């Protein structure tokens, strides 16, 4: 459109003007020319500053009073609307209508005040440069004949878009750098009068140095135009009006209104400055008001759909437009109103006005950009625990909200990876990508599509919470009230929209089509038709479903009604019936009561049928301990999972010393899954969710499923054989401990205790664990490992309530209220269906909080001292009391001098008889006969090694005597019973014994004080033993008990009780007194028994006289005596000792010798070879005993061997025994062949890190495959190894707590004392000790391996140690068979 035909008004951005009340602050250039001559376009001065580099950041708006012009000047009466358009070079529409009001309207509008403020909204320079100077047109149009109209400036947002920035406002070169100074970019002046502004004045202001750069000025008049210097001619002044008047419907729906920042529109809606109802663009944060929260929808804004580019529409203002109301401008920060004439500050690019620079600086800038998850686009700005990962080949990092989003993004970036995740579908059998995985009956089924998933659900009868309309999965309690009851069936929906769609469509959705087709084919279901009839809940009338009115019923579900009146009437009836209390007091059902019962306490109970009455009567026979009746309905338990109350027998879960109760098995299983209650299954040895814990022989065994429990029961019963029974009292599977016949029925029990308790329960002598009443106990439950019996379910529930909340009134009960007064006090009065007059309700009692101040008093206690009379030394009755105090001599003890004020010790001599040896001189002829007697003994060579050794020592003694015979022939000492008295110097008990002698106790018996806890193994349990106890060795015959003579019977005439009592296993301290006392008992019995028979292999022509004092014997004598001792020792009652008991006694003798400074080691030294052979024969016949829990019983423990130095690194043999013991215990080597497979090349040191403490520890590692080889019968099997194809690695962990008993330290010491060339050999591990080596020598061992016989002897002793069976339990090991 030609600009010459209209008078256009254009706002310039950078036109400097003088600040003053007399100047009209306007940028309307060449206004006078438009009135005096033809219409000329307004000259825009923005081109002058188009490429200016002035960094303007803020605008200043001056609000000043406007002077009214003289009334003689004609008034422009049309509403002038000034708009900011976002498009460049917009042409005015030619079809715009002209507004021609009548003269009356013009006269009525004369003098009216119309005040509007124009604020330009500047954007960033980056989007504005390069645009034309007229990209934003301030257009004003009016008909030529219109003269008396007021000017109205309106910012219409219909053509305002943030995406296309107003070039007219932003081409001034204002920068948006954050460090730029705050400068003025816009000034708006409101004045009451308009003065002339010429071009000369505007040009003169260009060169001024102003602190506040004024780049834009807009003048708004509120009265008639005053005198202008060039004169105004209204006939030639035309205003082009481009307006948009939305319809009433569009304004109401979208909330579009005029853009009046900081003012109130005509409708009265509040808009703070800078607000716009339609700023739905990426920069919408600019228009957020400080008076409204940023996360709250502002009034008039219903939708947030962006309207970035709206079409240019021509809207016509109505002829009868009312003038706008006066508005008020407020500060965006402090909300103070801005007065006229006050300077207002404005930030570039923002529509907010501020009263001062302080408010401008303190006002929050653009908020921090939101961080979104790359995959799901979720806001993760404030989220903790986000994941930053570099997922592609580039170096950029992406941020995700969770690991699932990261996985999905990686799969999306790598589509080839998803091709590898193909499996075969369980339903259709296709090899494709899997969408669903269902874990059902301990198996994972993979399904490729929803169709296969629905077919799988229907085939297995699985019920899932899915929306009936869209098929979305619903949680158990997340459906809310979105439930419809149609023909008695509940249909669940995810939201209300799905409910509406379901009611409108009336048919099933597409995702259930396959399921419905399958059900129709299988069960001949009739398909539901569109618009089916539904029964009204109130009047039971058949109506179409989509015509029904839905309402939430009393049960929480949506119920259909035919009309609102029917719904209200049904609610009224239900409210009346609900107030009557028709809930059955027994089954809790909402039904019409058929029976009523009046209780002794005046309460009225309702019942739905006779069955509930009978059950209630049976329960009401029980009374509470205080004699008051307690109704069963008053006892409610709370489920620990769903938090619902219930009054049935609970499901119990005992975990971590806490007992949890649940209303059903389902809640119990869900609770285990939710709280991750996992444990190692006793059968499959895998960590899974706990299914059940069952007692086996008193030991709790956890299982992951019912199948593992049954399989373990079968294995357990197969191990115990015929002795495996189920206890009739505690119901555990165990070995038969007791049997009782009751009324002709033989019942088995695990112990005598269970037998006695069952007998009490059977004869109704047991008491209820809740009310303490005797009688018939119908209910029982296992509580914390004990069986609890109760009268009925009522007492059972009370017991659980007491465990949850202890009630002191229920802790004690009467002796027997059941048979005394319980029946009389709990009788009910049946009145049929007619209700009796309601009794007076009892007064409701509530707890009342009262402000009470406690009264405190101080109580003093007076203690009167008790006076006693004490005599002193001045009295006549004083007498000195002598107390004997033994003091060892010649130790000197200083005696303090108290000047006779206290008692002092006085030394007193006591004569003690001391035996003195007397040396009698022998005649010459007698001494000459001694060598002849020695030669005669030598001629009688005996096959016994002991006799030969004794003869050798005798010969040595005779040679020493022969040397001294020439000097002093009278000093020859003759002993007829024992020879070699010079060897006794190392065993003098008077000088070197540091352990006290043990007094003889004839009744002391190790097997009585430390009894066995189980019977020995029989033939059916021989498979539990390692081969060393079975086929590798033949059982050695044990000598029978010999008949006692008269003297022996006199000595051992006492009798002791049998050791067959079933006592539980306990830790028994090691005492050497048992071994020393057994030696004395054997020596005393041997001396008294004249008819004692010796074994054939130990017969000799010369006997050694044995003494009760062990320290008085030489090495040869002890070897001889101990060899006889282990074969002839008997218990005080005449029975044989068990092999482990004999080994225990010998260990006690060894400790006594070591404690008495005797250097002999009866188990290692070569001088005790005969004793070692006899002991090994006896130990080979040992058969281990199995305890009820499946462990091995033995009286020998590992700590005993360390105490008596059988294990350690102090000698070569002890170090070998230590390595042999550790390999047997930790590597599980139970046969000689397994030990022979060990070598230096297969055992190596390894560092292992603890995952909890992150600490490195050394360990010895050994691979099982190297042990197993090709011998299947010698495979090492442990409890943790369940698959034969696995090759577990056995380790010996470093003992940092006690380095002296560390396996790794012992192995390093063994390597250091071995030859260096043997470290990598694969055929030897146990080396032969050097005969001449000492403890200080660098090498203790030779390169020769130990022979098999020595290893067998070592293994026999090691297998008697109880500690080696702690890890590998042979009774309960599944792989031993």
Curated annotation (Swiss-Prot):
It comes from the Eukaryota. The keyword Transport does not apply. Residues 85-177, 273-305, 983-1002, 1028-1064 are annotated as: Disordered. The modification Phosphoserine is found at residues 159, 305, 838, 958, 1064. SUPFAM superfamilies: Glucocorticoid receptor-like (DNA-binding domain) (SSF57716). Coiled coil: none annotated. There is a cross-link at residues 48, 88, 98, 104, 147, 253, 297, 312, 325, 348, 366, 417, 441, 491, 503, 513, 529, 532, 576, 603, 649, 658, 688, 700, 709, 764, 788, 812, 829 (Glycyl lysine isopeptide (Lys-Gly) (interchain with G-Cter in SUMO2)). Pfam families: DUF3504, zf-FCS. Changing residue 387 to V: Found in a patient with congenital anomalies of the kidney and urinary tract; likely benign; no effect on localization to the nucleus; no effect on transcriptional repression activity. Residues 139-152 have a biased composition (Basic and acidic residues). InterPro entries: DUF3504, TRASH_dom, Znf_MYM, ZnF_MYMT-QRICH1. The modification Phosphothreonine is found at residue 1376. Involved in the negative regulation of transcription. It is linked to Neurodevelopmental-craniofacial syndrome with variable renal and cardiac abnormalities: An autosomal dominant disorder characterized by dysmorphic craniofacial features, mild developmental delay, mildly impaired intellectual development or learning difficulties, speech delay, and behavioral abnormalities. About half of patients have congenital anomalies of the kidney and urinary tract and/or congenital cardiac defects, including septal defects. This is Zinc finger MYM-type protein 2. It comes from Homo sapiens (Human). The gene is ZMYM2.
